[in-house]
Structures are given as structure tokens and as C-alpha cells.
Amino acid sequence: MFERSRFTIDQIDPEVFAAIQQENQRQEDHIELIASENYTSPAVMAAQGSQLTNKYAEGYPGKRYYGGCEYVDIVEQLAIDRVKQLFGAEAANVQPNSGSQANQGVYFAVLKPGDTIMGMSLAEGGHLTHGMALNMSGKWFNVVSYGLNAQEDIDYDALEKLAQEKKPKLIIAGASAFALRIDFERIGKVAKSIGAYFMVDMAHYAGLIAAGVYPNPVPHADFVTTTTHKSLRGPRGGVILMKAEHEKAINSSIFPGIQGGPLMHVIAGKAVAFKEALTPEFKAYQQQVVKNAAVLAETLIARGLRIVSGRTESHVMLVDLRAKNITGKEAERILGEAHLTVNKNAIPNDPEKPFVTSGIRVGSPAMTTRGFKEEEARIVGNLIADVLDNPHDAANIAAVREQVSALTKRFPVYG
């Protein structure tokens, strides 16, 4: 028997407990600006830490390979129903353990090794699972990539021409570092014109889409994949939305195709997050995410920094650092010393190596969860610029860190 009072982390494993406490403090003390990170609610975390972690449930609700699944069936069905309602989807699979596995599930369902796929170039803002050479998608399939035009928007004309020429079996839309709105309807029409499947990976934009502040790809795509964290503010995991005609193929692709027993405690966290996302408060939050990102971009531009594409229409932006004579790697480290957490990121046609880069990626979801609004977004933009204007001055870094501390104390993550 486990006596709850005796089996606490601090008693069983002081080393892990100490690391968790230190990470808790880091999250409170630093302003999180990594666009793919966010803070989940205590309710989501409680679901993930529940006894559902003990239950094996291979299969799907009402059709399991194990007994005793009557309650996890309820949880999974709630997650399915809620995510369908959230995005207006005909069918959904909530079992993928990650966004990458959600993408892999679609590939396994409709492609064979050697088929041609077409996705956005990683070097111009795409994602590694859309055909990067070292990724499974790049090793198993023939990959053709589309990119940006001179205005650093997606070159839709070139995309259409390439699709007509190469006739891919699957066209992929979605990005990991692209700030503008994606015309899913237009790409969907291109796919339809050549008889290709159309998949949208909306992982980075899902929260905005759920709230109606970014275009919804669901009406235009055969498959829509997403993570459940990032802007959606749920647990780390994945989901596939699809047309009803593809539901059987996708379900078979996930189980038994690429996964075994689903993580029921994580699916519970997904269900809770989807319920949160259906509220008016979540819509207001996403509206603020977009407002904060716009102010952040405007502030950085006013301070002499170049934003790739010239603006943001979402939650994310790429900052070109070449004019400051500092690499993304160095900027990430120095901003981190000031308690401003960003990630280095390649910019289009980046001359630096992928682990060095000429840019940083900055996003507003996590700081908005803290309660930051336009005033705080402007302060954060100026603090970033203050660091980058004088990155090797220890006194400057310390002064910025003090201002960050004042902000984080006013806006705790978990009150």
C-alpha cells in the first residue's frame, strides 16, 4: 500500500524534488518568450498526475484490448468530442504522444516509402517533420520544398507551379517559425487540383485558431495535426483531426500502426485543456496574445531590429540580429542571463550554422498567460533591445535583470 504522506517526491527522491523546485523558481523568475512554450493550468497538471497513469488501454473507447477501461473510455471520449467542437472537425484521434507522431500517423496512413511529399522548407520557417533530410519524413519520402518570396511571405505562385510539376501525393502546410497568416484555402485548392492529400500542421497556431484569431485550416484539409501544448496551453501531446472518411485509416495508423497503449493521464490533461479552450476567457486570452505580439514586434522595429516578414500576424516573430553583429546563439545566452528566455533560430537564407544562427524566435503566449498586456509587452521589447544594444556590459545585463524581476513579481505564473 502507498501511504500518500510517505510517498512524496521530496521524501523518495530529494534530487529530483530539488530540480523540480529549481525549475519552478526559474519559470517564475524568467520571462518566457520561447514561442512554443507556455504554462499549463493546475487542473491540467493534476489530470496528468492522476491515477490514470496506471491504466493500460490499447484500442479505442468501447473497443479495448484490456478490461477495466470504462472510466478511461469516458475521459478519451470527452477529449475527442471537445476537440472536434473546438475546431469544427468531423473526426479526431487524441492518442498521438506528440505532434511529430501525429504527423507520422498521417504519413503512415496514406503514404508509402518513395512517395513524394511537399512541405515548407525548414530553412525558411517549416518544421523538421515536413521533410528534413535527417528526419524520418526526409529519409522515407521524396521531398520537394516550397519557401518564401521577396516579401518573406509564402510564395504561393511558386508553390502552385511546383505542385503542378512534381505532383506530390501529400502537400503539407504549417510552420515552426513563420509570423504571417497562412492561406490554407489557397493551398488546399492547389492540392485538390492535382489530386493530392492536404495536411496542415497547425501546432504553433492551434490556440489562436481555436479562438478564431487565425485562419482555421479544418474546412480545407484532409488532415490537421497539432500539438496540445504551445499556444493551446495543454499537456505535451498530439492530436489528428480529419475528414470522417479518413477516420478508420488514421485510427489504425496510430494503433496498432505506430503506438501501443495510449497515455491516458495525458489524454485526461488534453480533455481538461480542451474544455478550458472552449471558454470565453480563453478567446480573450488569445486575442491578447496577438495584441502583445504586435506590440512586441513594433517595439523591436522601433529600436532598430529587423523582423522577418516585417511584422507578425500571429503570436511569433523572427528577429534578424545581423545588424547587431551578434549571433542567435550568443543572444540566447546573454538574454538568458538577463532572465529573458528566447531560442536561437535560423532566418531565411541564414549564413550561419543551424546551431549558431543569425536570429532569435520570440513569442507572446507564455508572457500573456502571466497576465502581461500591451504595456508590459512594450517594456519587454525594450528590455530585449537594451540587452542587444549593449550585450557585453555586465552592468547593463544586471540592470535589465532587475527590471525583469520587478515584472515577474507583479505577475506570478502560479499565484
UniProtKB/Swiss-Prot annotation:
Pfam families: SHMT. Its EC number is 2.1.2.1. (6S)-5,6,7,8-tetrahydrofolate binds at L122, G126, H127, L128. Its cofactor is pyridoxal 5'-phosphate. GO terms for cellular component: cytosol. It is found in: Cytoplasm. The record marks H229 as: Plays an important role in substrate specificity. It catalyses: (6R)-5,10-methylene-5,6,7,8-tetrahydrofolate + glycine + H2O = (6S)-5,6,7,8-tetrahydrofolate + L-serine. It is an enzyme of class 2 (transferase). Pathway: One-carbon metabolism; tetrahydrofolate interconversion; Amino-acid biosynthesis; glycine biosynthesis; glycine from L-serine: step 1/1. The modification N6-(pyridoxal phosphate)lysine is found at K230. The keyword Transferase applies. Keywords: Amino-acid biosynthesis, Cytoplasm, One-carbon metabolism, Pyridoxal phosphate, Transferase. GO terms for molecular function: glycine hydroxymethyltransferase activity; pyridoxal phosphate binding. Gene3D superfamilies: Aspartate Aminotransferase, domain 1, Type I PLP-dependent aspartate aminotransferase-like (Major domain). One of its GO terms (biological process) is tetrahydrofolate interconversion. Catalyzes the reversible interconversion of serine and glycine with tetrahydrofolate (THF) serving as the one-carbon carrier. This reaction serves as the major source of one-carbon groups required for the biosynthesis of purines, thymidylate, methionine, and other important biomolecules. Also exhibits THF-independent aldolase activity toward beta-hydroxyamino acids, producing glycine and aldehydes, via a retro-aldol mechanism. PANTHER family: SERINE HYDROXYMETHYLTRANSFERASE. HAMAP family: SHMT (MF_00051). Homodimer. Belongs to the SHMT family. This is Serine hydroxymethyltransferase. It comes from Cupriavidus taiwanensis (strain DSM 17343 / BCRC 17206 / CCUG 44338 / CIP 107171 / LMG 19424 / R1) (Ralstonia taiwanensis (strain LMG 19424)).
